[in-house]
């Protein structure tokens, strides 16, 4: 299902014109407003006026986890804090968390790409969406919440935990969409089995699962135990959160990237060479 026909079906030529404009704007803002970015670009001899085509993207330096941590917490913001309406952060399990600031417009963009993602995954206006992603500094809960509301669904903002209560709520509210990590979806299924709750007592049709790796075997197990179609979603807080790309319910053959907002590159990590589609190496994204 397509949410935003204008941009999701944009002809490639028009899409690339839009991408180049946004790339130029992004590089200019980063260079002139953020000293660490300017120093990083100066090191490789890149200035905003050097961006003439999308091919010039490969000349930009990488932004790494260490670079983000070195400028913790707000050193990479392009706007003053009085224009930043929200801050999210990673868990920081391997060091200082990586921090991302959102303007009001960023929040609107996030809602837009998440609405596209949920529609792509089979969520419809009027669905009852049981959102069991965590709310807080983690981006999952609020990102999914915004997208579902924009799509016109009814959101149950339950977050994680209290699994027995969650099962009761899904039964009583007639929830037909489950948003959660795949491991928590299995937790729900196992708790249902322990309680003697039949899958048929739920109205679940589709589950949108992400925020952690999961296998095809895990997908099959979730689908069997919860009686739904399990769909994969991808995102990361350093870019925007969930909503970067999404598996479609029709084909389930890879993930669709919303290319008017995110530009993927396939890069050999050893040589830095940009490779054609189909190569299995590292994926880099620009937002």
Question: Which residues does each predicted region cover?
Answer:
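Conserved AMP-binding loop of ANL adenylate-forming enzymes
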Residues: 119-155
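Short secondary-structure capping/junction motifs at helix and strand boundaries
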Residues: 97-101, 122-128, 156-158, 231
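Short glycine-enriched loops at secondary-structure junctions
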Residues: 84, 107, 134-136, 183-184
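Nucleotide 5′-phosphate-binding alpha/beta core
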Residues: 1-89, 94-112, 116-120, 216
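Short, conserved acidic/polar surface loops in the N-terminal third of protein domains
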Residues: 99-103, 123, 140-143, 189
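Conserved ATP-dependent adenylate/AMP-binding module captured primarily in the ANL superfamily
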Residues: 111-128, 162-175
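Acidic/glycine-enriched edge-of-secondary-structure segments
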Residues: 95-109, 145-155, 175-179
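Active-site glycine/GP-rich loop and adjacent strand/helix microenvironment
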Residues: 2-31, 35, 151-287
């Amino acid at each position: 299902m397509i949410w935003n026909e204008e941009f999701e079906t944009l002809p490639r030529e028009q899409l690339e014109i839009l991408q180049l404009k946004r790339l130029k704007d992004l590089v200019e803002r980063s260079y002139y407003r953020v000293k660490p970015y300017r120093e990083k670009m100066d090191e490789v001899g890149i200035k905003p006026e050097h961006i003439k085509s999308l091919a010039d993207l490969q000349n930009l330096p990488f932004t790494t986890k260490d670079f983000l941590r070195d400028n913790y917490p707000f050193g990479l913001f392009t706007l003053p804090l009085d224009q930043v309406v929200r801050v999210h952060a990673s868990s920081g399990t391997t060091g200082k968390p990586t921090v991302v600031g959102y303007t009001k417009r960023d929040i609107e963009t996030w809602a837009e790409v998440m609405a596209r993602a949920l529609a792509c995954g089979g969520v419809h206006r009027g669905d009852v969406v049981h959102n069991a992603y965590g709310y807080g500094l983690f981006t999952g809960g609020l990102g999914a919440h915004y997208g579902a509301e924009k799509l016109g669904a009814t959101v149950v903002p339950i977050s994680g935990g209290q699994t027995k209560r969650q099962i009761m709520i899904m039964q009583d509210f007639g929830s037909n969409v489950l948003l959660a990590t795949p491991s928590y979806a299995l937790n729900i299924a196992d708790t249902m089995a322990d309680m003697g709750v039949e899958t048929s007592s739920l109205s679940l049709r589709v589950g949108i699962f992400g925020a952690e790796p999961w296998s095809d075997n895990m997908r099959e197990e979730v689908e069997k135990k919860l009686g739904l179609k399990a769909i994969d979603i991808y995102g990361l807080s350093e870019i925007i959160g969930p909503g970067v790309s999404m598996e479609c319910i029709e084909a389930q053959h890879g993930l669709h990237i919303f290319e008017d907002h995110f530009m993927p590159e396939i890069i050999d990590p050893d040589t830095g060479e940009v490779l054609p589609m189909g190569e299995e190496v590292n994926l880099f994204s620009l937002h």
